[in-house]
């Protein structure tokens, strides 16, 4: 009986630890999307004339996902601060949808610091943003995405899905 009770306690401990790992989202899925240089955005001058808080940049362009999947990337970026944290730097919030064909999407959102005179990050710069959801096989996705503007002007977006 004592051996049976010890086995039962051990089994319950393993089950509890697996439940904790499951609740913590330990699946660790990584999805990588690449694309060439970002095309010129549609620029909407919403605030004061010229670069200012409220201005928007909008894009839609193709990328490549796992297994050479064609990915459509729709991106909205809004200026939220000028000369912050230093002169010549803008704070911008981005929302983007990465569509993997059909109903599979990953959504990101977050703030990055950008050169005031540029539409995108400088080459060799990286910014991290939150994964705020998804649809299809990515339904309810959470985690973070690391977007890197590579030195050759291409881009790599690495989604770290919990």
Feature names for model-found ranges:
Residues 1-9:
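Bacterial N-terminal signal peptides that target proteins for export
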Residues 4-5, 17-162:
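Targeting-peptide/extracellular-domain and disordered-appendage signature
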């Amino acid at each position: 009986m004592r051996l049976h009770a010890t086995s039962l306690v051990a089994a319950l401990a393993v089950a509890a630890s697996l439940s904790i790992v499951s609740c913590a989202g330990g699946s660790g899925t990584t999805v990588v999307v690449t694309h060439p240089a970002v095309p010129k955005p549609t620029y909407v001058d919403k605030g004061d004339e010229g670069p200012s808080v409220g201005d928007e940049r909008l894009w839609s362009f193709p990328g490549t996902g796992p297994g050479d999947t064609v990915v459509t990337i729709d991106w909205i970026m809004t200026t939220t601060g000028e000369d912050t944290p230093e002169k010549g730097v803008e704070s911008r919030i981005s929302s983007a949808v990465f569509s993997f064909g059909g109903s599979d999407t990953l959504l990101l959102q977050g703030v990055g610091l950008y050169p005031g005179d540029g539409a995108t990050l400088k080459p060799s710069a990286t910014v991290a943003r939150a994964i705020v959801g998804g649809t299809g096989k990515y339904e309810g996705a959470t985690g973070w995405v690391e977007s890197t503007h590579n030195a050759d002007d291409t881009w790599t977006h690495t989604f770290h899905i919990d």
